Amino acid sequence: HTQGLVQILKKSGYDSYLFGRPHEEVCPLPPDGFIWVGYDGSEIAAHRFIGWYNAPLGKAREKIETWLKDNPERELGLILWGVGNHGGGPSRKDVREIDAFIAQCNDAEIIHSTPEAYFAEMAATNTKRPRREQDLNSWAPGCYTSQIRLKQQHRLLENMLFMVEKMAAAATLQGL
C-alpha cells in the first residue's frame, strides 16, 4: 500500500481505510489504528484488522470469544467474519450463535455493525492516534511473478490489440 493511496482515497471521498496486509511481522502498527498521512498531507483513519476477514462456517462466535480473551484491555474492537473468500457473507448459523453469545455476554457490549460505524466510534473517543507518514509496503513483492502463463497470454492479447489498431488505421486510410 503506497503512501500515495491516502491522497487518492481522501480525494475520492473516503475518510478511513481498513486493511489486513501487511501482517504484523512484516510491518508493526498500532493495534488501535492510526492516522495515515499521504504525500500531499491528506489524512485518513486507518486500521489493520486482526484475525483475517472471514471465519469458517460455525466459527464466528469462537473468533469473537478469542478476540475478547486476547484483548481484555481494549475498549473498542473490530472483528470481521463471514463465510467464503474475501469476507463472504453471513451465515444463518453464525448469526444465531453470535446473537446467543451477545445475549449471555455480560463482560462486553457486542453489536453487529459496520466498518464505518467502527471508525466513527474511534473518532468519537477523541483518542489521539499515532500518525504514519510512509508506505505500508512492502507486502509480497513479486507475488504474481509465478503466473507466467497468464502474463504470456496477456502480452499476446496486447500485441493483438496493436495489430488490430494498425489494421483499422490502414482500412480507414483506404476508405474501407
Where do the protein language model's features map onto the residues?
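Catalytic-domain carbohydrate-binding cleft regions of carbohydrate-active enzymes
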Residues: 1-176
